[in-house]
Amino acid sequence: MHIRGTMSRVPTLASFEVRYKKSFGHKFRDFIALCGHYCSPIKKYIFPNFIAVHYFYTIVLTLITSILLYPVKNIRYIDALFLAAGAVTQGGLNTVDVNNLTLYQQIILYIICCISTPIAVHSCLAFVRLYWFERYFDGIRDSSRLNFKMRRTKTILERELTARTMTKSKTGGTQRVSRPGKSDKRDDFQEKLFNGEMVNRDEQDSVHSSHNSRDSNSNANTNSSNNNSINHNGSSGSLDDYVREDKADEVEKYHGNKSYSSVGSSSNTATDENISQKLKPSSLRFDESQNKRKRTGAPSEKFAKRRGSRDITPEDMYRSIMMLQGEHEGTAEDEGPPLVIGSPTDGTRNMDNGSESKSAPTMNESKIRIQDKGAKISLDQDSVLHSSNSSACTSDEDSLPTNFGGTTPSLSAKPRESSSGPIAFTEGENADRKQGPSIQFNITKPPRKASKSKRVSTMDDLNPRSIFPHQKKSSKGYIMKHLPKARRIRQQIKRRLSTGSIDKNSSSDALDRGLISGLNDDDDGNEGDNMEEYFADNESGDEDDRMQQSEPQSGSELKLKQQQQHQLQQNLHRMYKTKSFDDNRSKPVLMERSKTIDMAEARDLNELARTPDFQKMVYKNWKAHHRNKPNFKRRGWNGKMFEHGPYTSDSDHNYQDNGNNSNSIVHYAESILHRDNSHRNGSEDVSSDSNETTYPLNGNNDHSQNDANGYPTYNDEEEGYYGLHFDSDYNLDPHHALSSNASKNYLSWQPTIGRNSNFLGLTRAQKDELGGVEYRAIKLLCTILVVYYVGWHIVSFVMLVPWINLKKHYSDIVRSDGVSPTWWGFWTAMSAFNDLGLTLTPDSMMSFDKAVYPLIVMIWFIIIGNTGFPILLRCIIWIMFKLSPDLSQMRESLGFLLDHPRRCFTLLFPKAATWWLLLTLVGLNFTDWILFIILDFGSTVVKSLSKGYRVLVGLFQSVSTRTAGFSVVDLSQLHPSIQVSYMLMMYVSVLPLAISIRRTNVYEEQSLGLYGEMGGKPEDTDTEEDGDCDDEDDDNEEEESHEGGSSQRGKSKKETKKKKKRKENENPNEESTKSFIGAHLRRQLSFDLWFLFLGLFIICICERDKIKDIQRPNFNVFTILFEIVSAYGTVGLSLGYPNTNQSFSRQLTTLSKLIIIAMLIRGKNRGLPYSLDRAIILPSDRLEHIDHIEDLKLKRQARTDTDDPMTEHLKRSISDAKHRWDELKHKRSLSRSSKRSTKTN
């Protein structure tokens, strides 16, 4: 074939360009990025963190609002600035009556208040982080969607497999049990290698079994047929005997000598031990002759005599090294089966039986010879080892294996035949090998899964002389275990997956059912076992092979068997030609799954789950079977809610599929994975690890529940949106967290989570995936926040506007103040929900002290608009999580928000912190309410109201005192102690929310300046000082006790203090919750107190004349302090001044008003998080640096505690209190007993 010397570069297809049109959002993001680029110096030095930005936003918005209010010229500018500051900060203090403002000014205050509330500000921060995610992570929207589809596909597959495995484990127990006394393979190999007993690592299990069974060889063959015939029925009582007899036959075939047969029925060999370890595909072996093996009476490679470990020649060491290299050497995918070169004397190996050698059967016929019972079998080692799973190999790509007979077929290629011809099977136990050294293909055996098929026992099964049923079952089992597993089939299957050309029509189903009907023509009472044998690669075929060997066969039986095999070959050929590998059988069988995760299978599942067509197929199939079906939930093995599988009893394996395609996807994926594993793993047996311990997945024996169509249902809980996933780097530990809560469904890997949702030790790929999940969670959260904020505004005025228009008495009061009732409803609803505290009526809410409905409605909106917002937000997300569709993208994002809220939003807390916040709010409001009822229930200010109204007024005032600032009674007329309590409540109003924000910070320890191993370092010095003082006190008390003669009392005190010290020193590395809460409180006090007293000091200087004026007794220092605390707490409550409707601030000078404005702005920033908070840091290199520091810090710690510290501290306190109470009771009992004894004496 001539090749041109030059090549043309002219393209065959004309290139064309499609210009990308940017959307409005993309252009807007580009504009923001351009502005940020030019303003980067300002952003870096003037706005280094969120707190600085918040200060700038508050001050600028206050100035803009004042500028918008002043042009009307009906108020002074200082009053406009004061009103603007009150609206921006929700302070609620007014120096003018709001009803005297124009509608324009009222609308400005309305809008400014709505865009400056804490909910609005933090929601804007969430939108900024969402934008920054899209700019920082390239293509995060598409990658997060693809990762979600991959996780969903893997979850569906693993749920199916796990449900079936759990069902089988409940009915049949564990699959593999590790027996005590088993030695490690590596240690056993090294010991026998240097003792001179064995060199080949692959033979260690068989030799180990043979050494343990030398004394029971005489009973092995006699017990074989009986045990096989009994265990063939699946009897649990004789299952171990059957497995041991199976191993005995394999070892006998392996060594070709009865003296090396395996243990009999009385052996204690473990049921899960594989006797014959298969040779590696890369190994090259020379077989020894049969006569030499009989003379030596030892395995193929063994030293002539036992010798010490020091008598090792270089040849022995070289051979051992080569063997170790072969042990770990992998096989490439394109490599074929390895060659096994037998010795020239193997041709005379089988001459003892006196039978003639038979020629290999052709492709259209099969000759089978069954050896007489008790006859000696001596075949090639690899042909025996891999006889049960040998696959046919032909040169034609479309050809199929057409010969399926005999118990131990060995695939051999004759030297004199052409390499292009087909390679025939050598049947019978006496193959002619006189031509010389034979070259054999070592067909690797796929992993063998233990099978526990349960069938109804019949007399035919129990009769060892019933030959024909076993022959039929053996042929079918042998056929199903020899389906084509070549590389070209895998490639065709993968090509079908990638192109989405999977045949799901009824024709393929009919063809598949036709095939299975052909397989089940001769029923022997175990329908569906063939499918299980094919997919699970169980050991039932070996059992049938032995049963075939136990009885002779006549010519008619052989002829009938050949006809059956020919018919099966045609069915298989049709199935292979149509590429119908779906498992849509009429009677699918529950496959037995291993409790361990194969790493190679996990990698295949990861690749398969990323295929788009396979994802669509799996999800469409799953969705079709979960539409409009009830969920039956039940407590499972780990205490969690999980859904049981579709199998309700042991005998219900052959359930009716009703034409559904529910399990076909799982069978399809399993069949691909099993075929891939058979070639990838070579001769490695996954279940052959003798030291592997399998734990039962379910301790109870409750029958599972299923839906109407027999399909398993699932439902996830809030605290565990769980699912089982494959991870190539994941090692299943028996004591791993998977036993109690599985890997999170929003991640494809098992995360290591530290304190406050801090993910540790992430790789770049894991960070990208976690960033995608966090991005989608923030995106959903932004939608929820907008609906929450706008929706509750709408609900609030919808509830108040109709009421004020229907109540003529109250509408007349509003009209008398010059305000429309409808506008009053809108304004009051906004003021209550945003905690502004300003009303359009000059006396606040005093005119509505008997209006029950608006007071109750306003109580609700005051709470959910400020301190109760995090509680209600988490409740809404939890309800949405419960109602969201299973395996949906929304459910995944909601689950992430519930598990890791502080990574996404500053005002969304974990479950424990939310409960603590709720208890704190209820406790504070209840305390104020009780104090009002106790101290002012009979005062003159509420004497005109009935008792019921007094209780309601007290409740409304206690709720408004902490946040809103509405007044339903004249506060100056209340009891002085109530005024003091209200002032304290105004100061601590924001503390529960602020402490919750800061103690749930992901970087809480770094924000407090703690970089060591102990979290309680701020109080370590105090502890040491206290300890020194205790030592001094102990010494002094001891001296006094000796001087005063009361040494016993001093010793008891000393012992109790030593016990306290011992308790403190028991857990030196334990994080101190009190130190964290104390550090937060100390920081807050250091932030607040000096500024409060500085403002009070300046105002007292400015108002000294008014304070000293005797004619103005209400102008005093306490009233000024009450006003300052109200402004600093952004509450808006005021004691007022006699004969005025405005706040007390109206009586202050201009400079004092500026101090109050500064208090409002400073107090607005009290509830903000620290500058080092993950929820306010944008994705950048700085964030990665902080994460790196956190990883290094947590790696030095002995453990990471993910429990809520406040809850743990409360539990420890309660346990300590109980312990002290028990000690006190014990001491009292001892003292009483001593007194009684003294009285009796």
Curated annotation (Swiss-Prot):
Signal peptide: none
UniProt biased composition (Polar residues): 164-177, 268-280, 345-365, 380-411, 498-509, 684-708
Pfam family, one: TrkH
UniProt superkingdom: Eukaryota
Protein name: High-affinity potassium transport protein
Topology within the bilayer: Multi-pass membrane protein
GO CC terms in record: plasma membrane
Keywords carried by this UniProt record: Glycoprotein, Ion transport, Membrane, Potassium, Potassium transport, Transmembrane, Transmembrane helix, Transport
GO biological-process terms attached to the record: intracellular potassium ion homeostasis; potassium ion import across plasma membrane
Biased composition (Low complexity): 215-238, 561-570
Region: Disordered, residue numbers: 162-241, 253-316, 329-570, 677-714, 1011-1073, 1222-1241
Biased composition (Basic residues): 446-455, 482-497, 1050-1062, 1226-1241
Keyword Cell cycle recorded: no
Chief localization: membrane
UniProt gene name: TRK1
TM region(s), chain numbering: 49-70, 78-98, 107-127, 784-806, 819-840, 844-864, 868-888, 904-924, 929-949, 977-997, 1084-1104, 1117-1137
Compositional bias per record (Acidic residues), positions renumbered to this chain: 520-545, 1021-1041
Compositional bias (Basic and acidic residues): 181-191, 199-214, 366-375
